[in-house]
């Protein structure tokens, strides 16, 4: 009997989350209410609180899987041993378009991300942003230090500068996803504009770091 009750509870939670997703996408986070979500799920407003404390908890659970994808990318950056790479491999990291891999990974979650960025959903995004940028900054700092150590670059960047660069990249990605034209996926026009902006940033880095190592083929 207990197993049946637990299974029923699981099914109800899944129904509520699906209804919450529908309401969030339809009305936006601010206009969504527990009452609207309950009505969509076909349960009473009081019953919904047996499963969730509020809409922020629901949104957090909806975004959890998507957040895990992003965190898996940044987690893979932790502890990368750049010293094990050849000079050619090390330089190629600079032109590897990691940001495009990130966007491709998130393509199926674009509606949810668009809704998140268009509406104030509490502190969830702020917490995620902090962790994401912190990890990206550490990854980049280790990378630039290795370039300098080998003499491939002639200048070191400060941690604060690297933090600001990581923040800028994160902000550009967020601005792109938040654009109404990208609600159902990144458009080719927006993708081209973003790639061009990242190319400008890359060329600036090349000049500032005075990178003097030639790679074969296209750099970006």
Kindly give the residue locations of the regions a language model identified.
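Short helix-capping/turn signature of helix-turn-helix
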Residues: 52, 104, 118-122
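Short, basic, alpha-helical segments at the C-terminal edge of helix-turn-helix-like DNA-binding modules
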Residues: 34, 64-71, 76-78
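Amphipathic alpha-helical packing segments from all-alpha helical-bundle domains
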Residues: 101-108, 123-149, 160-167
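Short, cationic-aromatic polyanion-contact patches
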Residues: 4-10, 40-41, 119, 165-179
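Helix-turn-helix
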Residues: 4, 15, 19, 23-57, ...
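Hydrophobic alpha-helical connector segments
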Residues: 61, 76-108
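Hydrophobic/aromatic-rich alpha-helical bundle segments in the mid-to-C-terminal region
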Residues: 114, 147-201, 209-220
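Short linear capping/connector segments at secondary-structure termini
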Residues: 83-88, 116-123, 152-154
